Curated annotation (Swiss-Prot):
Record's subcellular location: Secreted, Cell wall
UniProt organism field: Phaseolus vulgaris (Kidney bean)
Keywords from the UniProt entry: Cell wall, Secreted
Protein name: 30 kDa cell wall protein
GO CC list: extracellular region
């Protein structure tokens, strides 16, 4: 994971 806000939101959208 890099940023957290961006990757976190993407991860949340995927899951």
């Amino acid at each position: 994971m890099g940023q957290g806000a961006v990757e976190g939101q993407l991860f949340y959208n995927v899951q």
